[in-house]
Amino acid sequence: MRYTVITLFPNLVRPWLEESLLKKALERGLIQVEVVDLRAFGLGRHRTVDDTPYGGGAGMVIRPDVAVAALERALPADEVVLLSPAGRPFTQKVAEELAGKEHLVLLAGRYEGFDARVEAFATRILSIGDYVLMGGEVAALAVLEATARLVPGVIGDPQSHREDSFVRGLLDYPQYTRPPEFRGLRVPEVLLSGHHQEVERWRRQEALRRTLALRPELVARAPLSLLEARLLAEMDREE
């Protein structure tokens, strides 16, 4: 899978690719990432990339001619993703859709963002949350990480991402490791029992409990299994 990240600050992106699983995936040729400096397409001697907004207002806006010149150099691509707080929510489902593509272009803005006409050249406009960052680089890296980890071979155990939060529509169950007791807090006995069916039941139950407590809106639209539906009914009776 190939990525092109277009940004005014390439040195914010490159170090992220030099650590951990992304570094290994790059070294093994499982993914390719090109980081494009938007300023290389700037205008004039000073490589100008932005201008004041029509109609007045604070801040500067990235020019469409500069942004599209950088974008067209990266084409062809399966998807052109513009990162913006005004975009549709980036979810695990969207990550799975994008992970099936061969080439993604990620447009990371700055200042007041891109001239609105740049949206005409994007296939998707995505947001990673209802808040505003100083630039789109963190959002672009979130999309890159969430999709790259779904590429076969990037994560050693394929079961790992099949059990992630949101894959089944619920949050993940709580995880524990050694020691079995820490400052009076014990690991649930069922996890030490070696009884696989009971462990699975506990995990499904705690995933439901955690989701109800932290993200109750997810439960209403999650495709619950028969076991999860029974567990949910039991929890309702307990209340």
From Swiss-Prot:
GO MF assignments: tRNA (guanine(37)-N1)-methyltransferase activity
CC terms in the record's Gene Ontology section: cytosol
Reactions performed catalytically: guanosine(37) in tRNA + S-adenosyl-L-methionine = N(1)-methylguanosine(37) in tRNA + S-adenosyl-L-homocysteine + H(+)
Alphabetized InterPro entries for the sequence: Alpha/beta_knot_MTases, tRNA_m1G_MeTrfase_C_sf, tRNA_m1G_MeTrfase_TrmD, tRNA_m1G_MTases_N, tRNA_MeTrfase_TRMD/TRM10
GO biological process: tRNA N1-guanine methylation
CDD domains: TrmD-like (cd18080)
Main location: cytoplasm
Binding site for S-adenosyl-L-methionine: G109, I128, G129, D130, Y131, V132, L133
Keywords: Cytoplasm, Methyltransferase, S-adenosyl-L-methionine, Transferase, tRNA processing
Pfam hit, one: tRNA_m1G_MT
EC id: 2.1.1.228
Record's subcellular location: Cytoplasm
Cited SUPFAM superfamilies: alpha/beta knot
HAMAP family per the UniProt record, alphabetical: TrmD
Main function: Specifically methylates guanosine-37 in various tRNAs.
NCBIfam families in the cross-refs: PRK00026.1, trmD
Family statement drawn from the similarity comment of this UniProt entry: Belongs to the RNA methyltransferase TrmD family.
Subunit structure as annotated in this protein's UniProt entry: Homodimer.
Protein's name in the database: tRNA (guanine-N(1)-)-methyltransferase
